[in-house]
């Protein structure tokens, strides 16, 4: 994944998909992979891990290693950078996080293009209070499974 200042790092995560699966579903422009509840690439155990957000737990190691923060924009996949507009690179001015404004405001229930806008909102309004608010809302989102699939 891509982290702060555009530096690549290995993001730890439990595998929730079949290895080397080519059954990808794209959006109407054939540009972005659609994340959907019935994704055929996700294993049965993976579905449980994702629904409970347990697949994210290994990222605490990234936080301990200083590669990620608890709160911040999600780390991006390198392949997606070629689709970025110049203004979207601002997401990399702060450490990437395990949770963030997009995750507590709908996650996969919202259009993917809004995640960059949510990340920019977070960056422009950063404060300890906002981080605490996001962490508290994360607990609620994880407990209810909202937007997780």
Per-range role (PLM):
Residues 1-149:
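Conserved small/aromatic sequence motifs within transmembrane helices
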